[in-house]
């Protein structure tokens, strides 16, 4: 084949594809995004007002090139002191944590911290509705586990072992995903927690 006009032979190059790096910090973001979309749905339909709490940030270093242009150059996320979400539904205070795992048989208890367990106990003491949404991404299953069930399990060994999915299925409630809202947890609160079916 003639490569007119310069008679050059084109070199073919093979580009190596880089292995995709797994970002473990954001692995729960799709579940979190589904919860946020659910909360937006509840808000827009005037069913509930529930928001994600901002993660506390510790500012370490600020650069002041000009007095009016302060720039944060170093900051770190602090460990959250309470739960992920809070709000109000029909006059009831709602407070919950959301966790996701790829495991098929258990939810790692190392995902829960002592101060979160203490916070949940305090919410229950004040008659608030407190729970955790547990998502098993490999199984595509989500459960609402009342906080008192989480606290009972946590007290066995202060959160050193994993919570078996059988315990979650027995003591929690399956959340059937839908299009709108994606994670309809208010249905369970209404039917099971406020409806008197749960002690």
Swiss-Prot record:
It catalyses: Endonucleolytic cleavage at a junction such as a reciprocal single-stranded crossover between two homologous DNA duplexes (Holliday junction). The keyword Chaperone does not apply. GO terms for molecular function: endonuclease activity; magnesium ion binding; nucleic acid binding. One of its GO terms (cellular component) is cytoplasm. Its cofactor is Mg(2+). It holds the Pfam family RecU. SUPFAM superfamilies: Restriction endonuclease-like. It is found in: Cytoplasm. Mg(2+) binds at residues 82, 84, 97, 116. The record marks 99 as: Transition state stabilizer. One of its GO terms (biological process) is chromosome segregation. Binds 1 Mg(2+) ion per subunit. Keywords: Cytoplasm, DNA damage, DNA recombination, DNA repair, Endonuclease, Hydrolase, Magnesium, Metal-binding, Nuclease. Endonuclease that resolves Holliday junction intermediates in genetic recombination. Cleaves mobile four-strand junctions by introducing symmetrical nicks in paired strands. Promotes annealing of linear ssDNA with homologous dsDNA. Required for DNA repair, homologous recombination and chromosome segregation. NCBIfam families: PRK02234.1-1, PRK02234.1-5, recU. Belongs to the RecU family. This is Holliday junction resolvase RecU. It comes from Streptococcus agalactiae serotype V (strain ATCC BAA-611 / 2603 V/R).
């Amino acid at each position: 084949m003639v490569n007119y006009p310069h008679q050059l032979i084109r070199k073919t190059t093979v580009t190596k594809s880089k292995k995709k790096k797994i970002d473990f910090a954001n692995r729960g973001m799709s579940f979190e995004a589904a919860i946020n979309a659910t909360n937006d749905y509840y808000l827009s339909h005037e069913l509930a007002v529930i928001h994600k709490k901002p993660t506390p940030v510790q500012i370490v270093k600020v650069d002041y090139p000009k007095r009016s242009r302060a720039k944060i150059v170093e900051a770190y996320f602090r460990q959250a002191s309470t739960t992920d979400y809070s709000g109000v539904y029909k006059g009831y205070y709602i407070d919950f944590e959301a966790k996701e795992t790829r495991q098929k048989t258990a939810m790692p208890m190392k995902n829960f911290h002592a101060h979160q367990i203490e916070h949940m106990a305090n919410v229950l003491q004040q008659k608030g509705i407190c729970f955790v949404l547990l998502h098993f991404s490999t199984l595509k299953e989500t459960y609402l586990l009342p906080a008192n069930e989480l606290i009972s399990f946590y007290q066995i060994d202060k959160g050193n072992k994993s919570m078996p999915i059988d315990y979650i299925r027995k003591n929690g409630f399956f959340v059937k995903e839908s299009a709108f809202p994606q994670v309809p947890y208010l249905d369970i609160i209404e039917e099971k927690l406020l409806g008197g079916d749960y002690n």
